[in-house]
Amino acid sequence: MKKTMKLLCLILALAMMISCLSACGSKTEEPAAEEPAAEEPAAEGGELMIGGVGPLTGDYAVYGCAVRDGAQIAVDEINAAGGVNGMTLTLNFQDSQGDPESAVSAYGKLMDSGMKLSLGGVLSGETASIVAAAKEDGILILTPSASADNAIQGNDAAFRVCFQDSAQGTASADYIADNGLPTEVAVFYQSDIDYSVGLYNAFEAEAAEKGITIKTVQTFTTDTRTDFTTQINAIKASGVELVFIPIYYAEAATFLTQASGKLDDGTIFFGCDGLDGILGEIANVEDAENVMLLTPFAADDPDEAVQSFVSAYNDKVGGTPNQFAADGYDAIYAFKAAIEKAGITSPEDSDLNEKMVAAMLEITVPGITGEMTWTADGEPQKPAKAMIIHSGVAELFSAGE
């Protein structure tokens, strides 16, 4: 009986052992949690696309084509010298015909094509129309020529190469007062575009501070820009020797042609960057005699870098570059300087925009439009020059001429 009981106990013990081993063998062990994969750095090198929008056709095509051509020359020079930080640059420039809605569409095409940095728009309305989208997309804007004060507002990653309108208007009054030019003046401006209105308002405010007397103010609109007889007669009646014309070159050409022979031969016509291109627009260059424009660029500046650009432009495009071409050229070199300062080596850098914005506030660019730095609100700090047209040629103005 005892032997039987021992045998039963042994059998039960074996059965329990087998059951335990079976249960352990059937248990599914959870695999060890995998460490999250570290984010791989973006591959170095590649092509970094710079996009731009501007009028390549239409009334203001001279501005858009000049910016595009100047920018392309800079891109070609940089790539020929080995690129920047192992990357090559490409330029994709879309035609807006000067229309803000078309500019928005063109900006969208550039984003779809892989744009990483933007030249914004050539005109102020174009740039203002895409600034919000660029902020949302995380794309830095450096517009060569959008000068309206509000063109880059609302986006901390928006900068410009040109002077803002209010700065140009103020500087114009300062230049007239400080360089022995007539201080009894007339003003002729376009009252339905921001560029002209902004320049006039700033000029008027500074003129009062600088002892400049505005004898008459004459205006026109887009719908009345073909006949300036009334305005010219009023200017003549005022007896002034200087007319401030903060307008674009196309309207200026019409005005100067109609004013020829009606205003005194020695009358000075003083404008800003919008007059750049007047010699290519006006039918008779003699009608542009004594036209002055405040600009940061002068094609006859003997500076070696300026003359190198003028030569390259003449070889590749033909003719003499205007300020807009120079602005486009400087914008690309500013991008290059910021890329180098930020240490960006790949177009796919996930922090490209943030790095570029920080770098823009630290770089100094020895541009052909003057040595430039930028403020936190995107405004350039650089000197201005004045040009005067004599015998169909624009040249640097020297006080006392």
Q: For each of these PLM feature ranges, what is it?
A:
Residues M1-M49, A80, D112, E136, ...:
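Short, low-complexity disordered leader/linker segments with a strong preference
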Residues E44, L48-Q72, Q94-P100, V122-L123, ...:
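Extracytoplasmic "Venus flytrap"
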Residues V62-D69, A81-I152, V161, F220-F228, ...:
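Beta-alpha junction/loop-to-helix N-cap segments that form part of ligand/metal-binding clefts
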Residues L110-V122, L142-P144, V185-Y189, G239-Y249, ...:
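Periplasmic-binding protein-like
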Residues A158-T219, L242, F335:
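An alpha-beta-alpha
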Residues Y200-L294:
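Extracellular/periplasmic bilobed ligand-binding domains
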Residues L256-Y329, H390, A394-L396, G400:
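Extracellular/periplasmic periplasmic-binding protein-like sensory domains
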Residues D315-A325, K336-A394:
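Segments of small-molecule ligand-sensing domains
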